[in-house]
From Swiss-Prot:
It comes from Streptococcus pneumoniae (strain ATCC BAA-255 / R6). Belongs to the bacterial CoaD family. Signal peptide: none annotated. Is inhibited by a series of cycloalkyl pyrimidines, which also show suppression of bacterial growth. It comes from the Bacteria. Reversibly transfers an adenylyl group from ATP to 4'-phosphopantetheine, yielding dephospho-CoA (dPCoA) and pyrophosphate. Gene3D superfamilies: HUPs (3.40.50.620). One of its GO terms (biological process) is coenzyme A biosynthetic process. One of its GO terms (molecular function) is pantetheine-phosphate adenylyltransferase activity. InterPro entries: Cyt_trans-like, PPAT, Rossmann-like_a/b/a_fold. Its main location: cytoplasm. The record marks H19 as: Transition state stabilizer. This is Phosphopantetheine adenylyltransferase.
Amino acid sequence: MSDKIGLFTGSFDPMTNGHLDIIERASRLFDKLYVGIFFNPHKQGFLPIENRKRGLEKALGHLENVEVVASHDELVVDVAKRLGATCLVRGLRNASDLQYEASFDYYNHQLSSDIETIYLHSRPEHLYISSSGVRELLKFGQDIACYVPESILEEIRNEKKD
């Protein structure tokens, strides 16, 4: 029997504790879980891709079956095929997330009907955490330590120093 391989993607700009929770839970469902940082190289992100990748790798270091990969200018289904993933993992906080994800699921299924999508609901303590919310708090100098993993906080601090 072949390994169960999943792919969880996002921009992770920055990664939040909500992302971490979904990844930890998804890692128990698969033999191998790839966490794909998808980014637009022509768009200035909050954190450079190198910082995001390094922060994610540190935050996920305790999960032996999880590997962080970065991609740009590629469709998620193409990355999934390349990595041998047969399942996409998505996190849902609310009905708006479901509606947003449903359109992607439609296109992904049209492009590759053998790749399934599973949805993991956010835990109540993470329902209102978002990367954009964290960026907004940072913009106004607020403490974000309770919203992001320590390794991400370190990357943000290091980036601010430069």
